[in-house]
């Protein structure tokens, strides 16, 4: 019997030295698993709410209340339920919390329990997590969207765009894509050194030089790619996470690169970029509530580049449904802690795919050694994963898990490559 017998929890540290929640689940048949919850730096207003302690301890960021929520309310709510009935488990979690934004018990407490149950159920079933969640047909390895240059809320520099990513779209396998990305990463380090720029790292392992702006950063990455012998646009494409909500203010608009800009002016800037660089994806190009701007932008350049809603959708099926109806964006960023349970995450992905939206599985800037998102990317066939630079162990843990999954799949493994993206902005 795979019913839940015990649930435990503890406070651990994430990659930024801040507390987070780890949950452990033991089943009646002896199967055991644990899951740790990530945390973001740039968070959407519409995300499910993390429960933090406040006060002086850990600067107010302690999670002892969330741990108490797991032990005191979540455990009694799910003990005795069959762990293989994930939707039943997650509904019990939602019922126990009873709030639309999960603010009473905390999305961090709920998610830890939800993911730990799924891991324990996979263990009980004798299956790898990607196979347990994804079924017999899960076999596509995602393109790693490697954040090799950090700005915005992830770095203390003047660069407004939060992430500059390389995507090894032309690689024949995930293993080779990882090598290509790592080689570009090290090439960029040498380019920065040659130019006398900082090689200090941001939260996600990318370099954080203080360069003049977006185009200058893209030019540096272009040089780095060319130095490796890889072809920009065919072997390696570029992608951005603008995180525009971080520099948007009601009344004044977007304060970007020293100027106040309208949504239309931001759109014109992006149109310039996709004409000049091999950009295949732009995440959060506009504010999370600028629906009119998003619709206009999607109409203007959505046939040339992937437009990813992160803060816009917060992995929430209701927000995504609104975007689909309005015609905003053409892809969904998937962050399990934005919504708080595995079932709701899978529902959001299913809704996206059924409506022709691409999906990109994603980490958070405050990560742990937990590798769940690597398995989920393969399970749901996202074809894209964003989990930082090929450096820092909390990032590399996910990439290494994908290497194991590719090896596990053997000849059945397929690397998503360029077909992961709905269209291209650049032809080499």
UniProtKB/Swiss-Prot annotation:
Q: What is its EC number?
A: 4.2.1.11
Tell me, what's a Pfam family for it?
A: Enolase_N
Protein's recorded name: Enolase
The record's listing under SUPFAM superfamilies reads: Enolase C-terminal domain-like (SSF51604), Enolase N-terminal domain-like (SSF54826)
Tell me if Nuclease is a UniProt keyword of this record.
Answer: no
The places in or outside the cell where this protein is found are: Cytoplasm; Secreted; Cell surface
Tell me the cofactors it needs. Mg(2+)
Q: How is the cofactor bound, as the UniProt entry phrases it?
A: Binds a second Mg(2+) ion via substrate during catalysis.
Q: Which GO terms describe its biological process?
A: glycolytic process
PROSITE patterns xrefs = ENOLASE
Reactions that this protein is recorded to catalyse = (2R)-2-phosphoglycerate = phosphoenolpyruvate + H2O
Listed pathway(s): Carbohydrate degradation; glycolysis; pyruvate from D-glyceraldehyde 3-phosphate: step 4/5
- One GO CC annotation: extracellular region
Q: Which enzyme type, at the first EC level?
A: lyase
Name the residues annotated as catalytic in the UniProt entry. Answer: 204 (proton donor), 335 (proton acceptor)
**Binding of Mg(2+), residues:** 241, 283, 310
Give the HAMAP family listed for this entry.
Enolase
MF GO annotations: magnesium ion binding; phosphopyruvate hydratase activity
Gene name linked to the record: eno
- InterPro entries per UniProt: Enolase, Enolase-like_C_sf, Enolase-like_N, Enolase_C, Enolase_CS, Enolase_N
Chief subcellular location equals cytoplasm
Record keywords: Cytoplasm, Glycolysis, Lyase, Magnesium, Metal-binding, Secreted
Q: Which organism is it from?
A: Rhodococcus erythropolis (strain PR4 / NBRC 100887)
Chain's role: Catalyzes the reversible conversion of 2-phosphoglycerate (2-PG) into phosphoenolpyruvate (PEP). It is essential for the degradation of carbohydrates via glycolysis.
The record's similarity note reads:
Belongs to the enolase family.
Per UniProt, where does (2R)-2-phosphoglycerate bind?
A: 162, 335, 364-365, 386
